Amino acid sequence: MTALLSPDQLEADLRAIGARLYHDQHPFHALLHHGKLDRGQVQAWALNRFEYQRCIPLKDAAILARMEDPALRRIWRQRILDHDGNSPSDGGIARWLHLTDALGLPRELVESGRALLPGTRFAVQAYLHFVREKSLLEAIASSLTELFAPNIIGQRVAGMLQHYDFVSPEALAYFEHRLTEAPRDSDFALDYVKQHADTIEKQQLVKAALHFKCSVLWAQLDALHVAYVSPGVVWPDAFVPERDSKRAAA
């Protein structure tokens, strides 16, 4: 029979889930970080990842709307500001668009979402549905993938700057900001989960929530790998580098 875990035991279980299932283990990331992708494949990654970036503040707004405690809302709303910014030129979304601009992707193509892979769209929508329909505790627990983000960000920035001459430090500014934002956010979410997952059932639910979120991130990379690496089957309406990038048009 499953026993009630102490808060520290629960944290250990959650970290074990991330160690096994976080998307830093996905083959696509190994290719990206070790310079094994061409410019078009990196463009495809950045374009599809924007759909996830765009929906992060929508996710956080959905969670915020369910918080009855004003003190909790004041803490959580910082996440929305981090991504939306205080102006169109500020925040995580703007910084991601700076990356796609630097990679030669037309801004309209990125923002419209019309060239997304279906797997990207479905994974992101599944995440939004999850945080809207599940309990507040589960929604907060699903954000705990941020516990593992600093490691992958460090690998990504170092690897991309080393291997891709079309990437600059300025283009990767999004990740530099996340090195401080993600630990702050994950520390708070982890403390909340450890405090409120006070029954066996709740502990099982928060572990399932993190497992689900890992699958959302993994599914996005699966879609990219199938379309742009192997076997190379691209959805007919999805991004094709030779056709859709500014570089090809020039």
UniProtKB/Swiss-Prot annotation:
Keyword Oxidoreductase assigned to the entry: answer is: yes
User: Pfam families from the entry?
Assistant: TENA_THI-4 (PF03070)
Q: Known EC number(s)?
A: 1.3.3.11
Q: What is any one GO biological process for this UniProt entry?
A: sulfur compound metabolic process
GO MF annotations, alphabetized: pyrroloquinoline-quinone synthase activity
> Could you tell me which InterPro entries the record lists for this protein?
Haem_Oase-like_multi-hlx, PqqC, PqqC-like, Thiaminase-2/PQQC
UniProt entry keywords in alphabetical sequence: Oxidoreductase, PQQ biosynthesis
Statement: the UniProt record of this protein carries the keyword Cell membrane: no
Function summary: Ring cyclization and eight-electron oxidation of 3a-(2-amino-2-carboxyethyl)-4,5-dioxo-4,5,6,7,8,9-hexahydroquinoline-7,9-dicarboxylic-acid to PQQ.
Q: Which family does it belong to?
A: Belongs to the PqqC family.
Q: What is this protein called?
A: Pyrroloquinoline-quinone synthase
